[in-house]
């Protein structure tokens, strides 16, 4: 039976990491079982936009404040982002590289917290990596993975409430707010319409659109036409206000959401703040991390 190319690449990477571990002095010999050493691995898609990076830094600060006795490490799932960061001299390990490094440092139990928005392809790839590292003879004893932002129906409702708490103070009643998600061909794209349902229960002028999924920007425009909107707020539904937020949402290009709104006579008010900058939204990720840590025991 042939393997999916992604699975084959993952296995090759894991085996390469295991060879490195096997040759490491930290794993030489057959001493007594290691004492439990717990760590946290925060995993984001990543961003190459320097102005957007403080959002992730702030998330890391929150995690360290909540768990001051547990070391925190980082990894990034986007290969292209890792390459750009490394070209700038910034350490940017993949999840597999980070887990191998933590095993070499002597960690035995690791809570991996996804900072993705939905359980799409990136999150499921992270699950496969984490499962591959758990229970290896000279690796990590236990690895648990915290859900992404919208991991359950209850999360969708909580995220809707958190987004309402994060709305711009200058927004006037009746002014639509459009949250831009990434979108995906993965079945998890259904999370966006699910979030839309809970937002509409709170405020009928809160809309969800995506760059590559559903609802599309055409769907959003249809809703704005019904509302005869003259002023619309645009906010990223992504952990950071990176390339999509600054170009696809707020850019000067003809196909940006801001430009398309302007051609219809609608004033766009982009807000370049990722969801990881919102304390209310971040609290949901922190709860997922607490659950992941609890599952280590």
UniProtKB/Swiss-Prot annotation:
Residues 1-28 form the signal peptide. GO terms for molecular function: cobalt ion binding; heme binding; sirohydrochlorin cobaltochelatase activity; sirohydrochlorin ferrochelatase activity. Co(2+) binds at residues 182, 212, 244. CDD domains: CbiK_C (cd03413), CbiK_N (cd03412). Its EC number is 4.99.1.3, 4.99.1.4. The active site is at residue 182. It is found in: Periplasm. Keywords: Cobalt, Heme, Iron, Lyase, Metal-binding, Periplasm, Signal. One of its GO terms (biological process) is anaerobic cobalamin biosynthetic process. Heme binds at residue 124. It catalyses: Co-sirohydrochlorin + 2 H(+) = sirohydrochlorin + Co(2+); siroheme + 2 H(+) = sirohydrochlorin + Fe(2+). GO terms for cellular component: periplasmic space. Its main location: periplasm. InterPro entries: Anaerobic_Co-chelatase (IPR010388). The keyword Metal-binding applies. It comes from the Bacteria. The keyword Signal applies. It holds the Pfam family CbiK. Binds 1 heme b (iron-protoporphyrin IX) group per dimer, which is not required for chelatase activity but may be linked to the putative transport function. Catalyzes the insertion of Co(2+) into sirohydrochlorin. To a lesser extent, is also able to insert Fe(2+) into sirohydrochlorin, yielding siroheme. Its periplasmic location means that it cannot participate in cobalamin biosynthesis and its genomic environment suggests it is likely to be associated with a heme or metal transport system. Belongs to the CbiK family. Homotetramer; dimer of dimers. This is Sirohydrochlorin cobaltochelatase CbiKP. It comes from Nitratidesulfovibrio vulgaris (strain ATCC 29579 / DSM 644 / CCUG 34227 / NCIMB 8303 / VKM B-1760 / Hildenborough).
């Amino acid at each position: 039976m042939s393997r999916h190319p992604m699975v084959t690449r993952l296995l090759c990477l894991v085996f390469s990491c295991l060879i490195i571990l096997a040759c490491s002095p930290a794993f030489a010999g057959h001493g007594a079982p290691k004492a439990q050493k717990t760590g946290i691995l925060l995993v984001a898609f990543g961003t190459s936009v320097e102005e957007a990076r403080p959002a992730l830094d702030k998330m890391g600060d929150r995690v360290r404040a909540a768990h001051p006795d547990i070391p925190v490490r980082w990894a990034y799932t986007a290969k292209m982002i890792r390459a750009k960061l490394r070209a700038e001299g910034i350490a940017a390990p993949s999840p597999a590289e980070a887990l191998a490094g933590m095993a070499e440092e002597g960690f035995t139990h690791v809570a991996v917290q996804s900072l993705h928005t939905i359980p799409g392809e990136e999150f499921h790839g992270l699950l496969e990596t984490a499962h591959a590292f758990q229970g290896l003879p000279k690796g990590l004893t236990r690895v648990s993975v915290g859900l992404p932002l919208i991991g359950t129906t209850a999360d969708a409702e909580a995220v809707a409430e958190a987004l309402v708490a994060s709305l711009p103070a200058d927004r006037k009643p009746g002014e639509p707010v459009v949250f831009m998600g990434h979108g995906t061909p993965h079945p998890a794209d259904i999370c966006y319409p699910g979030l839309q349902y809970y937002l509409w229960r709170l405020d009928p002028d809160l809309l969800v659109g995506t760059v590559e999924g559903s609802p599309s920007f055409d769907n959003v425009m249809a809703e704005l036409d019904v509302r005869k909107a003259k002023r619309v707020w645009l906010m990223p539904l992504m952990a950071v206000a990176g390339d999509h937020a600054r170009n696809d949402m707020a850019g000067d290009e003809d196909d940006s959401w801001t430009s398309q709104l302007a051609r219809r006579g609608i004033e766009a008010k982009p807000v370049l703040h990722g969801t990881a900058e919102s304390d209310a939204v971040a609290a949901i990720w922190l709860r997922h991390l607490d659950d992941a840590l609890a599952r280590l025991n």
